[in-house]
Swiss-Prot record:
InterPro entries: DALR_anticod-bd, Gly-tRNA-synth_bsu, Gly-tRNA-synth_heterodimer. This is Glycine--tRNA ligase beta subunit. It catalyses: tRNA(Gly) + glycine + ATP = glycyl-tRNA(Gly) + AMP + diphosphate. It is an enzyme of class 6 (ligase).
Length: 720
């Protein structure tokens, strides 16, 4: 079956756009072919700096004929109605068929469309694709009306079958499709005629072009790591940089060079960031010292001097860049060693948000909240306050101004230079974590206190000014902040009720972080000269906001637990219980219940509970009373009743102390033990007996079962 080969050859495509462009080319062309009746077995797209390539294998040589029937008006319909139908079908009156139907004679149009050759369809689809290609940015050149990311020079478009290769007849803005491509710009310039994809790929490789970006990346990494290994060094892994560099070259030649000794004492992260951001260099690390001592650059050509001239030029440019970094570092160190006060004062003039004040005001709120939270997480309040006050000082430093991605990390270096203990200095770096779902969370008590305070201040602040996430829009990353709080609390095993003081082992130290943070925003507003809310307004806002924000946390928690395989209805059942602002308590309850309901006993007990609850609810509605006065074993008539009484006594003796100790696994296991006696009870006993004493006693027994089960979670909310 035929194979389609397309290449769009242009000036250099930005590396960041190549992968998406290849995907778009494949999607647009293949979708267009399928819509026109041309199916295929497989397709793959490629990208290099100068070309987008698509190969479609085993496609149809032509589209199938299409026969379409369209029902029209009645045969005796007004002439205007018939004329309108003729216009819509493109047929004449004599071409219509008259058919008998239950509603009389009706006109039908039979439209037959012959199949079309693949070349004709490909030409239409490719021209549409080129003219409507979704580049993030595009340009026009010369007198052309065509827009492309960079000037488009050639279109290669071939259909190859058993009889040979055929050029698809296509011209787009003066560029006529052909069977010619070009090799490497420097190593193999000139035209190359091809006859199909295999021939195309082979000739390009011979012309120093590696078509597959993944293969280029593998070649870069293998060559770079081998060069480093030969000198007892290692290349710092950076997959994003590797992908980007693979998009900058068609024939990668990794070269390893030296960094001038003047710069080797810079922090490794500074060297790595400067080389990556400015030069697209890989960093090479000394395994013993951990210092960055070499760099790897990737050339797009081979040279007779084995890259010596290229390395010399790159080293010269790199030295100029690193001289700037060294200047920033030395200036920052002088300020850090003097106590960082100028930086902290400068933050008074840096706006965090026009409705939430300056960075300095925010830091003051975070420091207060961190000190409040410190006892809850095992940290010293004074140390937490100090750490919070220093954590963001580096935002005013020259190094962070140049490289914003180093915020926090540089703060740790500067805090250490100022003479602060390592645990306080580490907070500057750790309190931003986690930045993503795979990032580690802070584990040191001081870092936990400040990280929680930072994220809670952000959340409560934006809730206070009604700037909440909506749909897919979350410009202030509030969902990430909430997930960060959830992960810090859960992964560190923290008992930290967000709103209510819930009785637990450390109840005397319980704080209310959401409430405290919201009140801090109220005070901040009152202290500003333009504060538009009275304190009574703020109190009402605090009450509303903390409940709404807690619901937001619960929504984020559902997403988090869903990834663990815990169903949303199980979480809802646990959310209905007291203490639902204690995230660890809530999750432990949900995990235990989820595991129990996965067992046969747990699932059957749930059905038994629902049956008991339904019978009891119907009886209470019919009788207008609540059956919760306690069942008496002396009125039990059957062995099954007596067995259920005994099983309840045994289970409650375990469940109540287990719940008090928050041992939900033991509580759910004891609850599941009721399954067999409850099943036997329903099999042998008629609850709504004619004897009213027996009936009331049995309903009270069901009420006791319901109450026992509801101590763990609101099982009425569980589906199934």
């Amino acid at each position: 079956m035929p194979e389609l080969l397309i290449e769009l050859f242009s000036e250099e495509i930005p590396a960041r756009m190549q992968a998406r462009a290849a995907q778009d080319l494949q999607k647009l062309v293949t979708n267009g072919l399928v819509e026109a009746g041309i199916t295929y077995a497989g397709a793959r797209a490629y990208a290099t700096p100068r070309r987008l390539t698509l190969v479609v294998s085993d496609m149809l040589a032509a589209s199938a004929p299409v026969r379409e029937e369209r029902k029209g008006p009645k045969a005796d319909a007004p002439e205007k109605a018939i004329e309108g139908f003729l216009r819509s079908t493109g047929l004449g009156r004599e071409q219509l068929e008259t058919r008998e139907t239950p509603k009389g004679d009706v006109l039908f149009a039979v439209i037959e469309k012959p199949g079309r050759p693949a070349a004709e369809i490909v030409a239409e689809v490719l021209e549409t694709t080129i003219r409507n290609f979704p580049w993030p940015k595009s340009m026009r050149w010369g007198s052309s009306s065509l827009r492309w990311v960079r000037p488009l020079h050639r279109i290669l478009c071939l259909i190859r079958d058993e009889e040979g290769a055929e050029i698809v007849p296509l011209t787009v803005d003066g560029i006529t499709a052909g069977d010619v491509t070009e090799g490497h710009r420097f190593l193999a310039p000139g035209e190359i005629k091809v006859h199909g994809f295999e021939d195309y790929e082979t000739k390009l490789r011979r012309a120093k072009v590696i078509l597959d970006a993944e293969e280029r990346a593998e070649h870069i990494w293998a060559d770079a790591t081998n060069q480093a290994f030969a000198q007892g060094l290692e290349v710092v892994e950076d997959r994003r940089l590797l992908s980007e560099v693979a998009g900058l070259v068609e024939f990668p030649v990794p070269l390893m060079g030296e960094i001038d000794a003047d710069f080797l004492d810079l922090p490794p992260e500074v060297l790595q960031t400067s080389m990556k951001e400015h030069q697209k260099f890989f960093s090479v690390r000394d395994l013993k010292s951990g210092k960055i001592v070499r760099f790897v650059t990737v050339a797009n050509t081979e040279t007779t001097d084995h890259g010596a001239t290229i390395l010399a030029g790159n080293r010269k440019v790199l030295s100029a860049r690193l001289a700037d970094a060294k200047f920033f570092w030395e200036n920052d160190l002088r300020i850090a060693r003097a106590g960082m006060q100028p930086w902290r004062e400068a933050l008074e003039n840096v706006t965090f948000h026009n409705k939430l004040g300056s960075q300095a005001a925010r830091i003051a709120r975070i420091a207060d909240l961190a000190a409040t939270l410190a006892p809850q997480v095992g940290a010293d309040p004074d140390a937490a306050r100090t750490a919070a006050e220093l954590a963001k000082a580096d935002l005013s430093s020259e190094m962070v101004f140049e490289f914003p991605e180093l915020q926090g990390l540089m703060g740790r270096y500067y805090a250490e230079a100022a003479g602060h203990p390592a645990e306080i200095a580490a907070v500057a770096q750790d309190h931003y974590q986690p930045l993503g779902p795979s990032d580690a969370v802070p584990t040191a008590p001081l870092s936990i206190a400040v990280a929680l305070a930072d994220k809670l201040d952000t959340l409560t602040g934006f809730w206070a000014i009604d700037e909440k996430p909506t749909g897919s829009k979350d410009p202030f990353a509030l969902r990430r902040a909430a997930l960060g709080v959830i992960r810090i609390v859960l992964e560190n095993g923290l008992r930290l009720p967000l709103i209510n003081s819930v009785k637990h082992h450390n109840s005397e130290n319980t704080s209310r972080p959401l409430f405290s943070a919201l009140v801090a925003h109220a005070k901040t507003d009152q202290e500003r000269a333009d504060g538009s809310k009275s304190m009574s307004d703020w109190k009402a806002l605090v009450a509303r906001s903390q409940d709404d924000l807690l619901s937001f946390f619960h929504d984020r928690l559902k997403v988090f637990l869903r990834d663990e395989g815990i169903r949303h209805d199980i979480i809802d059942a646990c959310l209905a219980m007291e203490g639902n602002d204690d995230l660890l308590l809530l999750v432990n309850r949900a995990r235990a219940l989820s595991e129990t309901l996965k067992t046969e006993d747990g699932e059957n007990l749930l059905q038994g509970f629902k049956r008991a609850n339904n019978i009891l609810t119907q009886a209470e509605e019919a009788d207008g009373v609540e059956y919760s006065y306690g069942a008496d074993p002396k009125f039990a008539e059957t062995d099954e009743e007596r067995a259920l009484f005994a099983a309840l006594d045994t289970a409650e003796a375990v469940i109540d102390p287990a719940l008090e100790a928050e041992d939900f696994a033991a509580a759910t296991a004891a609850m599941a033990s009721l399954r067999a006696p409850l099943d036997a009870f329903f099999e042998a006993v008629q609850v709504n007996a004619e004897n009213q004493i027996l009936r009331r006693n049995r309903l009270n027994l069901l009420s006791r079962i319901r109450a026992t089960c509801l101590k763990l979670a609101d099982l009425t909310r569980i589906e199934g």
